[in-house]
């Protein structure tokens, strides 16, 4: 009888363990279902945004509203969005066209849009996409750059006509500098970020200098990419803000390492 009781107890324990495993499996399945199901639903929403942008290509007022709504959605987006059919290419084409890139082929005729607000929200959307991209999609920044984003953003810093847009561009560059610093350096992005540094507030200055410090880690293909910005960085070394000075020091250290002959300093 004692052995029978032990056997019964063991069977009950095994059944309890199986029940727990089944419960865990069900919870995991439900969790994955919410993730992928939610991702598909969110992707459908962004495909609707893409269609709305295409349909509003020649309606600046309507297009601005769509861009504002898209920016709001992306500002709270999580990595789940990218697990479905997120229309990355289509959205980037529309956003970059708003910033001044070539007309998308989806537009039957050419149109012009000189709205600074539209450009601001388009750039903001790109920044949010870079922020929301999950580790499982490691090439989002590269995809963004493949569309000619960096040269286009540089032109916005070279011809500052809308301060809010320039500040947003610097934030975008700070995100890109973590993964695509070499492309920024080759395009002359360091000088573009620093040439009007004193024109911005302290927080934007910190963003610009942080981005340049990331870019300074890259060995430049041409020394002029560094020598053009050395006078500005040298001036920043004398600023009173500790974070700006720290970024400037990082720049100098990286350049001395990458250019041991002292070609830049």
Model-identified regions with their sequence ranges:
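Acidic, Ser/Thr-interspersed intrinsically disordered low-complexity regions
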Residues: 2-28
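Regulatory, intrinsically disordered low-complexity regions in eukaryotic nuclear proteins
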Residues: 29-33
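Elongated alpha-helical scaffolds that mediate protein-protein interactions in large eukaryotic proteins
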Residues: 34-44, 51-65, 69, 73-121, ...
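Alpha-helical solenoid cores of large eukaryotic proteins
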Residues: 69-73, 125, 129, 172, ...
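Register-specific detector for alpha-helical tandem repeat solenoids, activating on a conserved position
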Residues: 96, 127, 151-154, 170, ...
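Long amphipathic alpha-helical scaffold regions
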Residues: 206-212, 234-237
């Amino acid at each position: 009888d004692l052995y029978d009781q032990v056997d019964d107890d063991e069977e009950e324990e095994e059944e309890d363990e199986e029940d727990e495993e089944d419960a865990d499996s069900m919870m995991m399945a439900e969790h994955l279902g919410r993730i992928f199901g939610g991702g598909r639903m969110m992707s459908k929403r962004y495909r609707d945004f893409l269609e709305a942008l295409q349909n509003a290509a020649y309606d600046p007022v309507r297009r601005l509203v769509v861009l504002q709504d898209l920016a709001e959605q992306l500002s709270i987006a999580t990595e789940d969005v990218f697990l479905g059919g997120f229309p990355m290419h289509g959205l980037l084409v529309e956003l970059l066209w708003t910033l001044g890139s070539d007309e998308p082929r989806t537009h039957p005729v050419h149109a012009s849009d000189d709205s600074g607000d539209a450009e601001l929200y388009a750039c903001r959307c790109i920044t949010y996409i870079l922020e929301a991209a999950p580790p499982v999609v490691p090439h989002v920044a590269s995809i963004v750059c493949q569309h000619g984003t960096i040269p286009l953003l540089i032109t916005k810093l070279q011809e500052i006509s809308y301060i809010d847009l320039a500040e947003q561009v610097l934030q975008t560059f700070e995100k890109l500098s973590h993964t695509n610093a070499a492309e920024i350096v080759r395009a002359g992005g360091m000088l573009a970020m620093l040439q009007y540094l004193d024109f911005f507030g302290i927080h934007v200055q910190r963003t610009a200098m942080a981005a340049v410090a990331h870019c300074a880690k890259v060995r430049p293909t041409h020394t002029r990419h560094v020598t053009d910005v050395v006078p500005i960085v040298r001036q920043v070394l004398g600023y009173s803000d500790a974070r700006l000075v720290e970024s400037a020091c990082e720049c100098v250290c990286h350049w001395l390492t990458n250019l041991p002959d002292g070609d830049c300093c």
